[in-house]
Regions:
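Long, folded non-catalytic interaction modules
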Residues: 24-150
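Surface-exposed amphipathic alpha-helical segments
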Residues: 144-168, 191, 197, 301-335
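Short, well-ordered beta-strand elements
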Residues: 130-142, 219-224, 300-310
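Bacterial signal peptide processing site
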Residues: 19-22
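Secretory pathway targeting signatures of secreted, lumenal, and periplasmic proteins
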Residues: 30-38, 53-58, 65, 69-73, ...
Length: 335
């Protein structure tokens, strides 16, 4: 086993550990948790306080999936993208505790039991683009109290890594530059289009472009108007529900789990809506996201809509990928 070279109590310090040049492995939306069977329930309760985002498809689907493995398998799993080890108490007959003590060393381990240093987090500990976390406390109550209101900050570290890795995956190779350049030349806007996406429909008279991808079925459309007042907060929800009937004709958005959020200074969008779409003519549906973005260069309002149909399968990762694609929209001044 590998003894940790650096230690970082998450409050307020985060250590950047230099180790191997090999890339981390595993899905970016999965948390690989090494814990004993008796502590699995506690691990889930703790992690759900941090990773509490859910999309409705319409069934609830957690954005981050929690997977468990035995602590004895650490050597095989140490390059996982998001690796978590949980230990309660100091009984080294417990696999999670034995592993934690080995990695931290006796002195640092005892600090997690007798002091307030219950959470250790490092970057790139055993692989590039890895987040590695050790959670150790004498009991469940102190473990839960150790978060101290820092849940959003902790989650942001995982979100930043997710976005970075997914952008590399989506946009590094085989982008459809010809289509991107054509959109910019014709309409003075474009987005980054990964390999596998095809243009389904383009209507210059209606200011509408529709892209699609199979396996699973995903649809992505962009519509725009020269009507800045469309972003009036009093009418924005109505515009969301009018959009699919106006553009697609055969689908509608449902009120079930509908959410409307206003963007802030850190958001690329002005408004974001999420919820469930359904077909009017056949038993088909799934989650949707819809974004409003104001083009200040040309005084245009853009509506960007992402849909997926993937019955019985996980959809959250695909929805997040389409949001990353949406966020790449850019404009140039119309001559």
């Amino acid at each position: 086993m590998d003894q940790l070279k650096y230690y970082a109590i998450i409050f307020p310090l985060l250590i950047y550990s230099c180790d191997t040049n090999r890339q981390s492995i595993g899905a970016d939306n999965e948390l690989m948790v090494l814990a004993s069977d008796k502590h699995k329930g506690i691990a889930v309760s703790f992690l759900q306080k941090i990773f509490n985002d859910t999309i409705f498809t319409p069934q609830p689907e957690p954005v981050y999936k929690i997977k468990f493995a035995k602590p004895e398998n650490f050597s095989k799993l140490k390059r996982q993208s998001n690796l978590v080890i949980l230990s309660l108490g100091n009984d080294i007959r417990n696999g999670g505790t034995k592993l934690t003590r080995h990695l931290l060393g006796k002195k640092k381990f005892l600090e997690t039991i007798f002091n307030d240093n219950h959470i250790t987090l490092s970057k790139n500990q055993f692989a590039k683009n890895q987040l590695f976390m050790i959670i150790s406390a004498p009991d469940e109550q102190l473990l839960m109290e150790s978060l101290g209101g820092q849940e959003n900050w902790m989650k942001s570290l995982f979100e930043e890594k997710y976005d970075r890795r997914q952008r590399t995956y989506l946009f590094r190779d085989a982008r459809q530059n010809d289509v991107e350049n054509s959109l910019m030349d014709r309409y003075s806007w474009n987005i980054k289009i990964p390999w596998g996406w095809e243009k389904i429909k383009e209507n210059p008279d209606s200011n509408f472009v529709w892209l699609g991808k199979e396996f699973p079925y995903q649809w992505f459309c962009v519509s725009w108007k020269e009507q800045p007042n469309i972003l009036d907060s009093s009418s924005i929800a109505d515009k969301v529900f009018e959009f699919p009937l106006e553009i697609f004709k055969t689908i509608q958005f449902d009120n079930y789990k509908f959410r409307l959020l206003s963007g802030d200074d850190s958001s690329w969008y002005d408004w974001k809506a999420t919820g469930i779409w359904e077909s009017i003519v056949e038993p088909k549906g799934g989650p949707f996201s819809l974004f409003f973005k104001f083009d200040e260069l040309n005084q245009r309002v853009f509506i960007i809509n992402a849909l997926i149909h993937y019955p019985g399968k996980d959809k959250s990762n695909y929805m997040r990928q389409m949001e990353l694609i949406s966020s790449t929209i850019k404009f140039k001044k119309i001559n």
